[in-house]
């Protein structure tokens, strides 16, 4: 593997261990040229997913982009990083197990919202504000009003 610091082609694996949830292998590597150390993560990829954007463009699914989006929504929230990783893994597994190669971006957004709603209300609203393109305070009020109404109907049943 190429060193991210100096670009040298030869690196050595110093340590390998499975992640806590067992879905990946974390490898500690060392560059033989500059001696810098870095970590890589190896995961099983069941199939290459293609995301169908709203304008019908197709792009390769990027797990890192999904992770960044969720981390932005959860920024400064008291959520353990391992829990975030498990959330991301759960979403990706749902997408991979759907049997579809092409996944609408809307489905990914809805899965993220559903997951965030179960984990943290503030992160859920943050993500929804970007995903649903809120433009003013009225959009927040409408969204939160709908959430309060659905919460009340859940509690009364």
UniProtKB/Swiss-Prot annotation:
Its cofactor is Zn(2+). Transmembrane segments: none annotated. Keywords: ATP-binding, DNA-binding, Metal-binding, Nucleotide-binding, Repressor, Transcription, Transcription regulation, Zinc, Zinc-finger. Binds 1 zinc ion. InterPro entries: ATP-cone_dom (IPR005144), NrdR-like_N (IPR055173), RNR_NrdR-like (IPR003796). Belongs to the NrdR family. This is Transcriptional repressor NrdR. It comes from Granulibacter bethesdensis (strain ATCC BAA-1260 / CGDNIH1). The lineage of its organism: Bacteria, Pseudomonadati, Pseudomonadota, Alphaproteobacteria, Acetobacterales.
């Amino acid at each position: 593997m190429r060193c991210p610091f100096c670009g040298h082609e030869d690196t050595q694996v110093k340590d390998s261990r499975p992640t806590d949830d067992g879905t990946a292998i974390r490898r500690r590597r060392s560059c033989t040229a500059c001696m810098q150390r870095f970590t890589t993560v190896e995961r099983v990829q069941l199939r290459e997913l293609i995301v169908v954007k709203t304008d019908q463009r197709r792009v390769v699914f990027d797990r890192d982009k999904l992770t960044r989006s969720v981390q932005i929504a959860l920024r400064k929230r008291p959520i353990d990083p391992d829990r975030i990783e498990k959330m991301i893994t759960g979403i990706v597994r749902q997408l991979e197990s759907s049997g579809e190669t092409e996944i609408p971006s809307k489905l990914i957004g809805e899965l993220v919202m559903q997951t965030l709603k179960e984990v943290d209300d503030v992160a859920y609203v943050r993500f929804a504000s970007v995903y649903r393109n809120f433009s003013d305070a009225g959009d927040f009020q409408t969204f939160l009003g709908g959430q309060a109404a659905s919460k009340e109907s859940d509690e009364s049943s």
